[in-house]
């Protein structure tokens, strides 16, 4: 399916959207020994045999849509085992267990449309890998559907995302007031906190953080160790200088965030992009997927504009990696962001205040966790220079200044 995408010059192209399937299989067709072993393990916990599969995702996890002989359609998500790396295996297992627990907790404690988990299997005698079997939710991924929605439906999708389904409910759920990734509480049916699981095991935290200041110091430390800043002495020296300047600015900014409502810890989906949201033709949000990366963070970091509307920081066309594309044009993104800000301002003033107050800090975090190559932090430095010129407009969501 071709969808409109914009390049850094603002030119529109029609590119392949998120695949509806990477590979289809039906009974009678050839299977690898590894896939045959895995499907046999799945069939041990399904009510009937598997007649066909579709590979929905194949990168960090294997996600299959399976059709059974009795007509049921389910989703199976396999956690790939690590290849002889105990540290990576612990990371993979930890995010699998955390995702399972959080999805079950959200189904019991919220109205957020997460898939219902039918079965959980761990690697062992009966299974070659950890996997879960879930219900299949209706709808299409927003990445493929957004351009097909009417202007009214796009605004309705923002309203539905905030008010009825995800964002504002996450903002108000009762969660522990420490910074990290969730684990089951013991005893009880609540949540506890473990060190934050990163999108790569090398980016995970080694402890739980009590304050926003501690967490920001951790992120700066990770960036200084990141391969993205370059390997040479010159690149590292330039990067360290830029990061020190930015950290000094952040420390000053943190002193202005005095309201307890801005520092209250909030549950957030760390990967809430347009391929992890399902919508119908009217803009109703029908599913929120892929909770393996989530965290509890201060409100100023946990809130934000929808990721697919971003032309900021690492998505600013002047400084973005060459691999970045945009699924919404700049002018439309400005209008939809304005609508989003208006919606949350009416529905939850504290959310809106965190949205405004945290705009600069969230941009900094996006740069610190970005793993695209940036030797010497030259892209980051260019953004810092441009942001200084914007002045007070950094914190005004209704006055978004487009890039020149």
Curated annotation (Swiss-Prot):
It comes from the Eukaryota. Part of the gene cluster that mediates the biosynthesis of clavilactone A, a meroterpenoid that features a unique benzo-fused ten-membered carbocyclic ring unit with an alpha,beta-epoxy-gamma-lactone moiety, forming an intriguing 10/5/3 tricyclic nested skeleton. ClaR, ClaS and ClaT are sufficient to produce clavilactone A and the function of claY, if any, has still to be identified. The biosynthesis begins with the prenyltransferase claS that transfers geranyl pyrophosphate (GPP) to hydroquinone to produces geranylhydroquinon. This is Clavilactone A biosynthesis cluster protein Y. It comes from Ampulloclitocybe clavipes.
């Amino acid at each position: 399916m071709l969808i409109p995408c914009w390049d850094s010059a603002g030119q529109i192209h029609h590119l392949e959207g998120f695949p509806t399937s990477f590979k289809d299989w039906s009974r009678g067709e050839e299977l690898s020994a590894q896939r045959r072993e895995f499907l046999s393990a799945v069939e041990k916990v399904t009510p009937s045999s598997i007649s066909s599969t579709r590979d929905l995702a194949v990168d960090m996890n294997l996600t299959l849509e399976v059709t059974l002989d009795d007509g049921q359609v389910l989703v199976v998500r396999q956690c790939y085992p690590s290849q002889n790396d105990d540290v990576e295996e612990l990371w993979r297992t930890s995010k699998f267990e955390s995702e399972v627990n959080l999805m079950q907790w959200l189904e019991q404690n919220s109205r957020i449309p997460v898939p219902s988990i039918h079965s959980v299997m761990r690697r062992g005698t009966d299974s070659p890998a950890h996997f879960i079997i879930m219900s299949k939710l209706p709808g299409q991924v927003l990445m493929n559907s957004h351009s097909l929605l009417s202007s009214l439906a796009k605004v309705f999708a923002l309203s539905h995302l905030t008010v009825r389904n995800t964002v504002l409910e996450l903002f108000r759920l009762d969660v522990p007031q420490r910074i990290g990734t969730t684990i089951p509480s013991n005893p009880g049916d609540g949540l506890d906190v473990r060190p934050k699981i990163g999108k790569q095991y090398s980016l995970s935290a080694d402890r739980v953080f009590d304050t926003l200041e501690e967490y920001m110091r951790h992120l700066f430390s990770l960036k200084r160790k990141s391969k993205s800043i370059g390997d040479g002495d010159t690149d590292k020296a330039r990067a360290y200088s830029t990061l020190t300047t930015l950290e000094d600015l952040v420390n000053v900014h943190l002193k202005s965030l005095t309201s307890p409502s801005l520092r209250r810890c909030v549950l957030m989906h760390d990967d809430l992009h347009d391929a992890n949201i399902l919508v119908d033709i009217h803009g109703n949000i029908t599913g929120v997927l892929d909770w393996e990366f989530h965290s509890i963070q201060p409100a100023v970091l946990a809130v934000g504009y929808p990721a697919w509307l971003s032309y900021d920081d690492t998505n600013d066309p002047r400084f973005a990696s060459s691999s970045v594309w945009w699924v919404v044009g700049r002018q439309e993104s400005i209008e939809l962001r304005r609508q989003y800000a208006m919606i949350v301002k009416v529905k939850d003033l504290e959310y809106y205040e965190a949205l405004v107050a945290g705009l600069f800090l969230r941009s900094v975090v996006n740069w610190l966790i970005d793993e695209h190559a940036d030797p010497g932090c030259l892209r980051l430095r260019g953004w810092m220079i441009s942001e200084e010129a914007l002045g007070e407009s950094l914190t005004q969501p209704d006055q978004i200044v487009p890039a020149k």
